Amino acid sequence: MAFSVSPSVIVREVDASASVPAIATPPAAIAGVFRWGPVGEAILLSSENELVNRYGSPDDTNYETFFTAADYLSYSNALYVARVDNGATHADTYTRVTANNVTTTTDTSGAFKGLYPGELGNSLEVAYVRSEAYEGVIVEMGEDGTSNIPTNKITGNTDLTHTIAFNSANVSFEVSKANKLPIADIDIDDVFVIGNNSVGYQNIPVASIAEVARNAGGTVETDDALIAAYSYDITFNGKYTLPETSLNKLKIDRKWAWSGLFAKKPQDGNYHIAVIDQDGSVSGTADSVLELYTDVSTTTSAKLSSGKTNYYKDIITQESAWVQVANTAHFEANTSTSSYESLAGATAGRTESDATLADLAGGYDLFKSANEIDVSFVLQGKGDSAGNLATYIISNVADYRKDCIAFISPASSDVVDESKTEKMLSNVIDYRNSLPSSSYSVIDSGYKYRYDRYNDVYRYTPLNGDVAGLASRVEPYESPAGFRKGVIKNVVKLAFNPNKAQRDQLYSNEVNPVMSQVGQGIVLFGDKTGLGQNSAFDRINVRRLFIAVEKSIANAAQSFLFELNDEFTQAQFKGIVEPFLRDIQGRRGIVDFRVISDATVNTPAVIDQGKFRANIFIKPARSINNIELTFVATRSGVEFEEIVGSLT
């Protein structure tokens, strides 16, 4: 407190409102192989749709990892996902087919590359056009009045012959020196709009442009420059299907293939950009539009009226989920033609079955520090038969942090690939025995059979995402198992459905059985941790209760750092902890408790060392694992009071 010599009013404020924060369930975490998304970065997701949008839909290379994450998100709404580095590469080369002096070429140095590594990048096309190349009239024919256009072909004046064979995909242009068509302005995938007001108009995309070494008179052209610039055939992706009738006028316009997605052409010098899913691997539908960027500028200082940048590179860097700018000079050089760059060169890398322990460990290490990311559960996803990944997660993440639980499933080869339940049982027990004993782990009995709507197939996927999801739906001091709270979602059947004798064996080895029962569904039928000894911490609810209580009280205790260790501080600490524990007791999570933080533990020696000590004793509530029902038949004349209490 400040002192004053002369008369004055000193204001002092004391905060006596400190309390222990309420118990909350932090997000879960998983690392694994995904088809798309950032590598080596933990992203918080809240739904399966976000999972698909950020990391792509599953395929045969990663469905176990994907559905572990998706299944957890069907119970909860907070999951950190980390994509591991499995050796996948970016789509950083391009197939850009252009009509440059009527030669079809391939350009492997394009303006864009895939934003993330992975084969999905090969499905992307980036189409862009500057205002000058957005649209234009190719030719108008039949206007000179010399003759009508016959039904089998369309012919212009003597300097230009443009032939369309009805119901054919081939169109032939023949051009002499006197009438030069701007071939340099035409690009593969541009759209020709052919027709007139009488018969209507038809859009036909350009498929290829090839050189024709002749002029309008039918003689061979010897001037290479003229051949290259003005003599060509065009083939379309589609047939000319307008009415087969004589026409006295026909107009052909060229336009950018994706012009229909924009209200108008870009302002002078600006560009429209479209990111397209060419083969449907991203969206499920070929040629789906993923992203549009309207009227963007190549000027680095360009701004919109709102003050937001209009520089194309900055916009794509900030907003695109699919591409990044790789070569600004290449992009800005395309001023007079439209461009369609098909991304290529990406590789998928190692699958979830081939991923090394080093690959996966690198992802799970992102969750190793309790000070950086707060998580409650760590999901294993796909397991390996040797238990190496599970051991790493238990030992180096869960046991290391001591504030989260690892959820583990056996390998698919232990149950899915076996036909006899006796062998499945021994495999699962052997798998569990290969893992370390820890109260920070929970082990289930296997795999479930579920529907994969993304590929229209049924697949076996691990149950650790479901078991963790069940735990996320109950209070930390409650068991997630049983017919009320332990019903598994999104399941057709189990790979291993243990009977009573097999469940006894599994439970004796700290494996929580998941079983199917007629009329009840498929349920989690155990709530043990992976601790291989008799202890209060061999139950999920007790371990979770202590994690929650320890984290909450530890967070509250931070405010006492650098305070004076006297009776007032000791009583104040007890005063904020006891109401917190009393609230949990009132909700049936604790049977009894006691907090000791007085001079009996804060001795002068402890105080002189700059320490503060508090002992917190807790009697946790226990879940029911066995129910014994005794039915007693008595004689008619016997009073119940005579025998009640005599039975044990």
Q: What annotation goes with each model-predicted range?
A:
Residues Y134-V137, K255, S259-L261, T298-A302, ...:
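Short, cationic low-complexity segments
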Residues F236-G260, P266-A274:
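Surface-exposed interaction regions enriched in Ser/Thr/Asp/Glu
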Residues M1-V97, G110-L115, V193-N196, D277, ...:
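Structured, hydrophobic secondary-structure cores that serve as assembly/anchoring elements
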Residues A99-T105, V126, D253-K264, Y364-K368:
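Intrinsically disordered, low-complexity regulatory segments in eukaryotic proteins
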Residues T106-T108, N122, A228-Y232, Q267-G269, ...:
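Residues at beta-strand starts and edge strands
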Residues V97-K113, E119, A127-T241:
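Autoprocessing Asn-cyclization modules and mimics
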Residues D287-W322:
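E2/UBC-UEV (E2-variant) core
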Residues N237-I252, D279-T299:
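Acidic, small/polar residue-enriched beta-strand/turn segments
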